Amino acid sequence: MRKEARAMGARFKTEGITLKKGDLIMALTSNQHVLDWVKEMEELMTPDKTIWIDGSEGQLRALREQAFATGELTELNQEELPGCVLHHTAKNDVARVEDRTFICTSNKADDCMMVNWMDPNEMKAKLLPLYKNVMAGRTMYVIPYCMGPIGSPFSKVGVEVTDSIYVVLNMDIMTRVGVKALRQLGDSNDFVRGQHARADIDPENRYIVQFPEDNAIWSINSGYGGNVLLGKKCFALRIASYQGYKEGWMAEHMLILGIEDPQGNVDYITAAFPSACGKNQPGHAHPARSVCQAGLQGVDGGRRYRLDAHWRRWPSVCHQPGERLLRRGSRHQREIQPQRPAHHDEGYHFHQRCA
């Protein structure tokens, strides 16, 4: 931690908090539930060092530069593709893996044709040896993140530990990370615990496992976005479905698109479309003149609500299996024209930041 602090400067500035070397962890949160769980992860996976992601642009910039130096990311021609970098995945790791994705609950009756079920204790006994010392020689990144707007009573908080800078940078693109997420959580124990380790990218020991009753997600031996960006399908659909069942709301792999004409009239279209057809693009587009709004909507007591956990940035397309482009741009960029739909299951995304 201290070594990393020297690399990024002796002092950090984070939303009005001045952080000295060596005290970053306690400065980010005093939530004992979070601190105890992260300590448990450190003892299990034994990383050489642990870095807490505070969400500051300076820290993220330093991580990008580190990834360039190690080859985890490659900076592309900045004249032709300004703000773009390239990330490679293994050739055997370019899609979600249905046969290795499990829902583990205590009730065997939860087993059905739509999921792979296993008893939680049996699954943990299988996976714990894979996680043992898996981060030795590596850095553990702790990513507090919020799904939904900060301050919204509908938003949900998660914390993901990972050994991948690619995961850190993409979670910043797709969610609200750092101090603001921890402030949303406060002292609560109501957060999703996500543990990811690339390990050896061994397809025979690749697992993406949800434990709804524990509010936990375990992912190992993958570097592909859908398997390792745990706020996506793992949390926003699988864990959230259980949360919604318990709390009286729904999580759906759908969209409700509001289209507003120049006169201000809004019509809504519902769409239950499969993966890789472009559901996200309309919701993430910010044309020069606003023509549409997208998000999850509902009606309660005569009032309409919506919440889209994705924000700020949207995916378009690049063309090489096993590769991803990550576009770095202004957090305040708004006028972005949509391109072709992203193929989410093929292992490559092009991300552009927008407000």
Regions found by a protein language model. Give the residues of each.
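Short, Lys/Arg-enriched N-terminal segments with co-localized hydrophobic residues
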Residues: 3-7, 11-25
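Short loop/turn segments at connectors of secondary-structure elements within structured domains
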Residues: 8, 13, 265, 278-279
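Conserved internal helical-beta-strand scaffold that buttresses enzyme catalytic cores
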Residues: 19-277, 287-299, 306-355
